[in-house]
Amino acid sequence: MEHNNNPGTPQMSSEFPASTTQTSSSAAAYDNSSHFEKEQSLMRWEQDLKLRERALANNQSAADITGPHVVVPAPATAHPRQANFPSSYPMIRLNLEEDIAIREYRQIVKFGIFVFLWEAAALVYNWVVSIGTIVYSAVDNFFLALFYMIVGVPTLYFLTRKLYRAASVPERARKSYAYLMALLGVVLFNIIFFVGFKRSGMNGLIWVISLFHNDHNAVGAMATVSLFFWFVGVFLTIALFIMYLRLNNTKRQRGEIQNAGFREYIKSR
């Protein structure tokens, strides 16, 4: 049976059915339309993003020009506090009310300053007594006492400054307990000077007995005053150690400061 093709009608190949060809062309058209819509959406999103960035930049520049300038203060530790003592020629910082917030620690520092002045006076007077011993050919005693005074007074000063700084930040256990360990050395220092070995530059008990035994009564009387200085110094330094350690432990147990105990500090060394 013959198939007649009308003129003007497109001739379809028998290998590709009409339905398949129409479906493929429709899918291609849909894909092209989908890609076009995505591109348009991306372009709109990008344009919107640029507009927002431009508006944000304009607002920022306007705020910089017309808005208030806020100056953020630096931390307190960035700039050291100015010296204020003595007032005529300030060399050190001494302001208990501003630097030490806790009242009990201010009292400890005041007592520590008194102990420093007492110990410094004891060292100076110890050297004065040794001047009198030169008459009895105890020249070595004089130079040793001079050495103790030159080294001891600055050392005691720096220890007192350490107490001042530790009381300013009592929550830092390392500073507090480092001072207490150094203070134990000062206690031992006073005990040795109180004993006072002969010709050692320490005008204490043994040296006083020796002076009176050899009928050096005048110098012996001066050395007795030095002995009194060291006797009182022993109790002052022990009292300072106990007061500061007890205050630290009390504040720690109450939760007012957060630091480790003295035993934990010793174990960590």
Curated annotation (Swiss-Prot):
Keyword annotations: Membrane, Transmembrane, Transmembrane helix
Membrane topology: Multi-pass membrane protein
Compositional bias ranges of the Low complexity kind: 18-29
Transmembrane segments: 111-131, 139-159, 177-197, 225-245
Residues covered by region (Disordered): 1-35
Residue ranges with Polar residues bias: 1-17
InterPro entries listed in its UniProt record: SCAMP
An annotated GO cellular component: recycling endosome membrane
Induction description: Induced by srfA, during development. Down-regulated in grlA null-cells at 16 hours of starvation.
Entry keyword Translocase: no
Subcellular location: Membrane; Spore coat
GO biological process, one term: sorocarp development
Family membership: Belongs to the SCAMP family.
Protein name stated in the entry: Prespore protein Dd31
Name of the gene: spiA
